[in-house]
Amino acid sequence: MKKIFFAQCSILLLMLGSCSKMTEDMTPESVNKEASVKSATALAGSNGVCIAYYITDGRNPTFKLKDIPDKVDMVILFGLKYWSLQDTTKLPGGTGMMGSFKSYKDLDTQIRSLQSRGIKVLQNIDDDVSWQSSKPGGFASAAAYGDAIKSIVIDKWKLDGISLDIEHSGAKPNPIPTFPGYAATGYNGWYSGSMAATPAFLNVISELTKYFGTTAPNNKQLQIASGIDVYAWNKIMENFRNNFNYIQLQSYGANVSRTQLMMNYATGTNKIPASKMVFGAYAEGGTNQANDVEVAKWTPTQGAKGGMMIYTYNSNVSYANAVRDAVKN
């Protein structure tokens, strides 16, 4: 989920411990669709929704999950994996990606505190090479995987949905298609660390739409965080754009000129309503606040955007608050 300049990855590996996808180069259906657009605008403020990623590794220990401020609409738990929520005996509280919580009871209490204030809490779900197989996540089938995610996220933890982090490695398309180009997309080329949306991969998302998203019967959020430069992007949008409540672009560091190019492609080629499109602010990096605030205030030529997501809110709270204020004020 952490998208940065490709050239800076080696530096960030030392600083952050890993370098997941960021932009490689930061330079120069009617019924379902109608329901989907209404869902996407329901929470929006003057410049859309504010979505906060909260990384659970224990950083900034004085800023708890429950301290997420008002005017944040949704929080995505990031770092902590669904299998730790499934079996709470394997990762003790206060360790690893449970570093932000003394115990699972502490986690539960803080989740309820946010929900009592009207803030939705979602679980991040990473795509995985196993999604390209008949046994995603080691489950017997895509249907079994979808059932398990529903059981963990909805039944056990009473969360408000999931967000798919689509950027991880697996088999690439063969042949790799020609990239549309910077002027068309706001990106210079494919992100080579991503994987193809094979039929099996798409079937995993299809199973998740039974329980999450605009066509599910329970009002649970289905979001995606990815990039137009990800190999799977176009096929996912072709098949599921109407199912997502919000579509987050990991557009970290981009200025308004560049995000407008992204919006042009998303609304034109991908036929995504502008009101679903959420753009990314990289609080963790801490170096692009002026651009992020400008993008947060920006109204695209297509009309109001969906809003902004902030990665990771608890890494740099003053930076994150500035972006939130730009979205909501």
From Swiss-Prot:
It is found in: Secreted. The active site is at E167. It is an enzyme of class 3 (hydrolase). Carbohydrate at Thr-88 consists of (2-OMe)Man1-4GlcNAcU1-4GlcU1-4Glc1-4(2-OMe)GlcU1-4[(2-OMe)Rham1-2]Man. Residues 48-329 form the GH18 domain. One of its GO terms (cellular component) is extracellular region. PROSITE patterns: GH18_2 (PS51910). Coiled coil: none annotated. InterPro entries: Endoglyc_F3 (IPR054978), EndoS_F2-like_TIM-barrel (IPR057016), Glyco_hydro18_cat (IPR001223), Glycoside_hydrolase_SF (IPR017853). Gene3D superfamilies: Glycosidases. It holds the Pfam family TIM-barrel_EndoS. This is Endo-beta-N-acetylglucosaminidase F3. It comes from Elizabethkingia meningoseptica. The gene is endOF3.
